[in-house]
Amino acid sequence: MINGERSIERPLRWGMVGGGRTGQVGYKHRTGAQRDGTYRLVCGAFDLDAERGRDFGTKIGVAADRCYGDFKELIAKEAGREDGVEVVSIATPNFTHYEITKACLEAGLHVICEKPLFFTVAECEEVARLAEEKGLIVGVTYGFTGHPLVHQMAAMVKKGMLGDIRIVDMQYTHGFNAGDDVGAGEAVKWRTNPKTAGPTFVLGDIGTHLYYLSEVVLPHIKIEKLLCDRKAFIPTRAPLEDHATVLMHYDNGARGRLWVSSVNAGNMGSQRYRFVGSKASIEWSDSHPDQLIYEVQGEPNRTLHHGMPYLEEESLACDRMGALHTEGLGDSWANIYLWIAQSIDAKRRGDEAFLRDHHYPGIQAGTEGVRWLENCVRSADAGSAWVEFN
């Protein structure tokens, strides 16, 4: 169980690019990063509007002279300080991720980036090589995989409690884009523009969360081929999609279905995962993150609760509140940030053995998410044809 004791040598000097007053995810990053005393926010380029960013930064405790106008100024000026920033979080629109990440790595800074990581696998692989050459960590904020019961599911699968995996069924939907985009805010505009969002809308924005979580739970099976059907129900969003279904064939013979939509009218936002094996099934939803349904064929269904001693150690190790109290998304983000901090600390100490065994969403996870998106787009653009996953 996590109790807030600092698990690294000292707090990391941390900065942010984006995530300011008008951003949607900045607060999630800050509360996650600062929960366990592993990061100390020392600087930021929080906003395209430099004055607004400076005003925001000072109001969250950053010195005015370390609130910069853009990421280039941040990198240049922090490099000249003995107490300069060591790790930078990137909470900006998709099209900026590659340039900012590469610049930070070239300056010797670790990076924590929003997903989807970049536009192409080629960009991901280039940056992965750069990070390896520089001896730096790149983390990706797949923020839902810090929930303790996600790791309970992975442990149950690993122990064979489900038997052979047969069916993978996942959805992440909401209805907040069910209407047209007249009067829509900037967050909607950039997400539905291929120049700023990349080749997908909901597949990249929310579908990659499903894909990565399934990789955490089912690391031993891989997609062999897939079929993607995507559609823009609001025509102005085309060629990007606001709804998509992906069918997947796995190398062990399992079948998968993934549904993502931002036009599921009336739905406030929900993720659901069901993993079916030859012996039993498990089902988990982020709407009830403290509960995991475990169904064994021929037996009464069981509801497993977070923090209980009957759970696997992998789950209990990332629990924060204990069984008496609920855990939420903020706790999950805190775990992600903690695991990345521990990885940065290990990299700094040269502890490669720790890094080999330590789970965190890194650049390989980000790369595989982009690879999945590339295959989805290739299938959809071929008339929703089956394509080999490569």
Roles of regions detected by a PLM:
Residues Y39-V42, A346-T367, V387:
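Glycine- and charged-residue-rich phosphate/anionic-cofactor binding loop of Rossmann-like
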Residues R66-V85:
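A structured beta-alpha segment of the ubiquitous adenosine-cofactor-binding alpha/beta core
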Residues I137, F144-A238, L292, G383:
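Predominantly a Rossmann-like dinucleotide-binding segment in NAD(P)-dependent oxidoreductases
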Residues G4-P11, L136, G163-I167, R378-N390:
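C-terminal capping/lid region of NAD(P)-dependent oxidoreductase domains
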Residues G204-Q291:
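Glycine-rich, aromatic-lined ligand/substrate-binding cores of catalytic
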